[in-house]
Amino acid sequence: MLSQCLSRTSRAVAGSNGHRFSKLSAIDGVHHAHPSPRRYTTFSSSDHADRTKRLLDAKEKAGLTYDKLASKLGITNTYAAQILLGQTKLSAATAAKLQAALPISEQDIEDMKSTYPMRGFDDEILKEPNVYRTYEAITHYGEAIKSIINEQCGDGIMSAIDFYCDVGTTTGVNGEKRVVITFNGKFLPHIEQKEEDNTAKSPRD
């Protein structure tokens, strides 16, 4: 009976967040599911993780901060971090600069240039306090931000595709270090769906 219950629980959890679970273990009498790497037809999270570790080790070996690496690559510091974390595709032009800046294998460079990344995130990351507080700030101020965007730009959204993000610091009035995050996204207005502009009308039986 217990094994059947655990089996049902494991399937339910796996279905809720996209993970597959390889086994269940008991800690203090409570059974915990251990996620196995996600697998996609063109993407392996274990390969991704191995490459990311090599890239971060190379960054540390080179003694570069993200700001210094970004300066060498001519990109924002968050985009430099995304490249190393496998959250964006590496362009040919930036690949040459990256290889000059860090001791990276030719195979890793080619894989980063040819792989279309899975840009989603594991829900587990929201348990990290730094990440969650950023998420909390955006959700807390979300309605106010939307209202101001609408007031200043009209009915639409800020793109996260035609988009720049930069992280920096400043000094507060009491001498404390403060974090500054800048989002610079293209405004995309919602369109009025006029029939004459619809080039792909659905068929009618």
Curated annotation (Swiss-Prot):
Catalytic activity annotation:
cyanate + hydrogencarbonate + 3 H(+) = NH4(+) + 2 CO2
Q: Which UniProt keywords apply?
A: Lyase
Q: Which enzyme class, named as a word?
A: lyase
Active site residues of this protein: R133, E136, S159
In its UniProt record, which GO terms are filed under biological process? cyanate metabolic process
Q: SUPFAM superfamilies, from UniProt?
A: Cyanase C-terminal domain, lambda repressor-like DNA-binding domains
Specify the signal sequence span: none
What family does this chain come from, according to its entry? Belongs to the cyanase family.
Protein name (database record)? Cyanate hydratase
Q: What is the lineage of its organism?
A: Eukaryota, Sar, Stramenopiles, Ochrophyta, Bacillariophyta
